[in-house]
Amino acid sequence: MQWAAASFVYFACVLPSVGQQTSPAPASAQQSDKPANAAAAAPLRLTLQDALDRARKNSVQFQAALTNAGLARQESRQAFDALLPSVTYNNSAIYTQSAGPVATAATGVPVVFIANNAVHEYISQGNVHEAIDVAAVANFRKVTAAAAVAKWQAEIASRGLVVTVTQGYYGLASAQQKVETAKRNAYEGDRFFKITQDLEQGGEVAHADVVKAELQMRERQRALQEAQLGFLNARLDFAVLIFPTFEDNFEVADDLHAAVPLPTLAEVQERASRDNPDLRAALATVQESNHGVFGARAGYFPSLTLDYFYGIDATTFATHTVFNGQKFSNLGSSIVGTLNIPIWNWGSTQSRVKQAELRRNQAKRELSFAQRRLLAEIRLLYAEAETALNEQEGLSRSAQLAEESLKLVTLRYRNGESTVLEVVDAQNTFALASGAYQDGAVRYRVALANLQTLTGVLTTP
């Protein structure tokens, strides 16, 4: 009993002190977790350049174009290597049945297969091989031109990706602005509905005004929901485009309405004529087809192969052979030259030449079309960008006037100087003008991105 009492007193004294020492730990841990949670919750702020860098890393189509360009470069390297001498080391052992009862393999013993030299034959030789072929040279030039085509096609994909990212980036910024405008319109619709109710209770307006105001309020609420849905769609589409994993904790910089200068038409024409990837790809395709015709015609020419061998080809796997008490070296060398002269192949070479000429003619047509299209696109895309820029000031002014008109018409309605239809019309006009202002800004940015598909330079704020 005394032991139990002493134990009770001990734990009664010790446990509270232990609890006092350990209890502050969770509080400090919670305090240390708060900054981490706050940092984790902070959205990632993206500029247009950030979005472009991420999209280049994660775009499947763009990476596929880069992969094709890399494959084409390797094919060009392989074609060049095929023009150089190659070295191999051949090792083989041939065992052939003898023609008679011979116990051991010896030089001169007849064998069943006359193509073989002895019962036992060991070959261990280094072989230097070189093929001198006009078709191989033409093939190297052809695949080099094909690599240039793939390179410019990758550049086309890169510039097209800029258009896609720009459209998604500023489309998201525009959708966010439209949500704010829709909230403002919903607030104005709700406020006007309350105004009509108050005026109806005072006997100043008819109940028809209240009904019309309620219809307008509900329409503005539906418009807000649609704007929020459009913002969600734009946000998710943009996230899929630029992030390797699903990520929605980000925001874009608010520079949709920042002033961006338009380059002059002369600058666009000069850069487009020098750096247009479509035109460069078409030119490289014509070069590829020209080399294809030359390669097909190379089928009429003879080809030469040279082989140099050094090593052993003996009945024993050794560098020396002893015969009749004399020692002979098995090491030796030989050179083989083969000249292949084409004579007759039932017109296959002529058919390949015809195919290559058809491809070349089509490539020339596509080059001519690319040149005409470039001239037309320079004028068309520049006119689009210039028109969008010129409309910016007017759209901004229209949005400001629509907002001011809404305030004045609502005030006049409260004073009994305007009708409910005028207020509804002012609200609709403000919604349309605000949306047109956002769409006009996106249109100008996308027009600049389309211009960079010709020039390779994206104009930014």
What are these regions (language model features)?
Residues 35-44, 90-132, 251-265, 294, ...:
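Small/polar, glycine/serine/threonine/aspartate-rich low-complexity segments that form flexible
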Residues 160-273, 384, 388, 429-430, ...:
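Periplasmic alpha-helical coiled-coil/stalk elements that build and connect Gram-negative outer-membrane
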Residues 64-79, 157, 161-180, 191-193, ...:
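Amphipathic alpha-helical coiled-coil segments
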Residues 21-92, 98, 144, 252-287, ...:
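Bacterial Sec-pathway N-terminal export signals of envelope proteins
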